[in-house]
Structures are given as structure tokens and as C-alpha cells.
A protein has these predicted regions:
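Short, well-ordered, aromatic-rich surface patches in folded extracellular/luminal domains
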Residues: 351
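Conserved beta-propeller blade signature
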Residues: 13-17, 65-69, 122-126, 175-179, ...
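Trp- and S/T/G-rich repeat-edge/linker motifs of beta-rich repeat architectures
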Residues: 3, 9, 13, 22-55, ...
């Protein structure tokens, strides 16, 4: 969602990018507009002319124009539209949308434009690229669309496809922070990427960048070391995404998706509960992971590691954990949204579990009561 005022809007309006199920007729998603927050009207053609598009990923207001990008396609990968294009309109009420970029910024391996944000008078866009790693592009949106875009970071910040996707973008203290991830929770089986934990980089207005959280490595700009001293995933292998970042009361927050809670259900054989990890050409990693899980036990992994991580920093380099166990609920696998308000800092969790959950017993899988299932909203206030 975003607040935007176009030429035909008498005042700022709320614009929303919803999700349209293919089961409801398959007409494609539409951008919605609301003046009062109660009534919403469509202001875009279904799927921008593509009935297979069920939703849009980002919705950004920049220089009096509204930008968005489709993120999926019915019958295809969860994050692969028919064309990875940024769309723009100068007046949403006139229902006139045009391509603001060439498909994939000229790279067919850019499967989607995953996130966008405004920083330093430019629009930044981050992609999902399972072959070479994410790319970050920027434009000043001058002239007529499609606009001229400039690459800022390529090849997953020289980590390759282990930085498959830009998942989160947040402006903080005159710099742009990028959180990475691998689709499907840190392990992309379709493209055989990962498993691997996520990183954070920091981009400056002059397009130079720092590695904040991640793996040290050589780059075309010299060797990069994580300025926080923390490895990928804040040192937690299970943190497959930096899913959301936000600012509140002078602090930068980063929330993760932690897939450790899914271990008992991931590629498990009900007979011996061994885990056959597909590690994208890294058989030694898969074997080591299997041995680790077997020695510790998947239930103990969930007990001590289950639940998202939330970290905060006042300078973007020194980080402190707020929680590493989903606020005590292992079924809170991810931080899905953050909102700073005068009343405090709101956080919404991703918790896909229901009122019952499957538990392994000597007799096999059994469903038991699970009062911790379902999404939660938390409010943080200064003490």
C-alpha cells in the first residue's frame, strides 16, 4: 500500500496492490484506490492486460507518478511474471499504465522486479536473478517512459546467486540498506540455489556500497568484510531472508524468515526422519547438514532456534538482537511487516500454522492442539 496524489485526485489517496486468486475467474489483479479507507475502486486493467498476473509486489509514489511491478504468474513459479517490467502511470484514475523499464532491464535472468524504494531523488529497483544473483537499478524517471535505468549493484553483490533476490529495502541515515534472500525460504529447489542465509548491504548516494552482514569476499571494488562482524543471517544458517526492515525512534530494525521450525516437515522420511538436503551441487554441505540435524535432533533445533530473528542498530553497523526466537513462539517464522507510528512500532508476523499442528510420535505423525498458530501483531514502545 502507498499514499499517492495524482492529477485527478483531490487529496492524497490510499492505493493498494491486492492478490487475485486464479480460482475466482482468472482475470488478473487490479490496483485499487480509496479516498476514505472504506470503499475501494479498481484503477488499473486486470493484470495490465495479462490475466495470469495474480498480484503486484511493490507500489511506490515518485515524482508525482505511481510505479508498480507484477510479481507472479498463474501456473508458473511463485515469483515469475510473464515479463519482469516496472509499470508507471501519471494519473491512476485515467487507467493509463505504461512500461517504465525494458523487460528484466535487458537481462532475461531477472525473473521479477521484487522491491522498489525512493532514495536520494531516484527510484531504486531490486530484482530476483537465480542465475547470477540479484541486481539493483535506479532511475530519475526523467522524460517519457520507458526511462533510462542505471545498474548500481550486480551479481548479488558478488556473492552470486546465493544472494538470489532483493527482499527488503530501507532508507536509514542517508544510506539505502538492502536485505537479500533466496526464494522458497532460503532454498530455491526450482533453480537449485542454496540453502544459504541472507545478507545486508548498504548503498550510498554515489553508488558505492558496504557489506554489513554477510560473508567476506573479493569484489571488483576490493575485498569486502562485514562491518558488523556478523556472518550471513546474523550468524544463523536458518535465516533465509532479511524479510523486512524498518526505522523507528532513530533505530534500524531487520526482521528475518527463519525456516528452522519447518525442519520436522522438510523432506522428512517418516521412517527414519533423515533429511535429504538438495544443496545445488554442494553434496558435502548436504551431508554435513544431515549429520548436524541428526546429532542435535530436529525437535531440539526447533526448541532452541525456532522463530524469526529481530535485530536493531543505531548506526547500521553495531547490531543487537531483540529476539531470536519469534518472541517466544517458534511458529512465528517471519517478520512480514513493520510500521512506525506515534503510538509505537508495530510488527506483524508470518505464522502459517493453524490451531492444530502435526507432531512426530513413535507411532507416526499425529495432530495436536496448537494455540500458538496464526499471525500475530506486536507493539513495541520505549520503556
Amino acid at each position: 500500500m502507498t499514499v499517492h496524489q495524482g492529477p485527478s485526485d483531490e487529496k492524497p489517496c490510499l492505493y493498494v496492490a491486492p492478490w487475485a486468486s486464479a480460482k475466482t475467474g482468472g482475470q488478473g489483479a487490479r490496483i485499487l484506490r480509496s479516498v476514505d479507507g472504506n470503499e475501494f475502486i479498481p484503477v488499473s486493467p486486470p493484470g495490465f492486460g495479462d490475466a495470469t498476473v495474480p498480484t503486484f509486489r511493490s507500489l511506490v509514489s515518485f515524482r508525482g507518478r505511481l510505479f508498480t511491478s507484477p510479481v507472479a504468474r498463474a501456473g508458473a513459479g511463485p515469483n515469475e511474471p510473464s515479463s519482469a517490467v516496472v509499470w508507471v502511470t501519471t494519473d491512476p484514475l485515467k487507467d493509463e499504465w505504461r512500461a517504465a523499464s525494458v523487460p528484466g532491464f535487458g537481462d532475461i535472468n531477472n525473473k521479477t522486479v521484487f522491491e522498489m524504494v525512493v532514495f536520494h531523488d531516484a527510484l531504486y529497483a531490486g530484482t530476483l536473478n537465480p542465475i547470477r544473483g540479484f541486481q539493483i537499478w535506479k532511475t530519475d524517471a526523467a522524460g517519457e517512459p520507458p526511462y533510462e535505468w542505471k545498474p548500481v549493484v550486480i551479481d548479488g553483490a558478488y556473492r552470486g546467486n546465493l544472494n538470489e533476490c532483493v527482499v527488503a529495502m530501507q532508507v536509514f541515515r542517508n544510506a539505502l540498506y538492502i536485505g537479500s534472500g533466496i526464494q522458497n525460504g532460503g532454498h530455491d529447489r526450482m533453480y537449485k540455489v542454496g540453502p544459504a542465509a541472507a545478507e545486508i548491504i548498504r548503498i550510498y548516494p554515489d553508488d558505492s556500497w558496504d557489506l554489513i552482514v554477510g560473508m567476506q569476499r573479493p569484489t571488483l571494488h576490493g575485498r569486502k568484510f562485514p562491518l558488523s562482524g556478523l556472518g550471513p543471517g546474523f550468524g544463523n544458517f536458518f535465516n533465509g531472508y532479511i524479510w523486512r526492515m524498518g526505522e523507528h525512534a532513530g533505530c534500524l530494525y531487520a526482521g528475518t524468515f527463519d525456516w528452522s521450525t519447518l525442519l520436522p516437515f522438510t523432506l522428512a522420511n517418516a521412517g527414519d526422519r533423515r533429511f535429504r538436503m538438495e544443496t545445488g551441487g554442494q553434496p558435502d554441505l548436504g551431508l554435513a547438514f544431515d549429520r548436524l540435524v541428526q546429532s542435535v535432533g530436529p525437535d531440539n533445533v526447533v526448541k532452541f532456534e525456532g522463530g524469526f530473528d529481530l535485530w536493531c542498530s543505531q548506526d547500521g553497523e553495531r547490531w543487537t538482537p531483540v529476539t531470536t526466537i519469534g518472541f517466544g513462539n517458534p511458529y512465528n517464522v517471519g517478520v512480514r511487516t513493520m510500521v512506525s507510528t506515534p503510538y509505537g512500532f508495530f510488527l506483524g508476523t508470518a505464522n502459517p500454522f493453524g490451531p492444530e499442528v502435526a507432531v512426530w510420535t513413535p507411532g507416526g505423525w499425529r495432530y495436536t492442539s496448537n494455540p500458538e498458530g496464526g499471525a500475530e501483531v506486536w507493539l513495541g514502545r520505549a520503556s
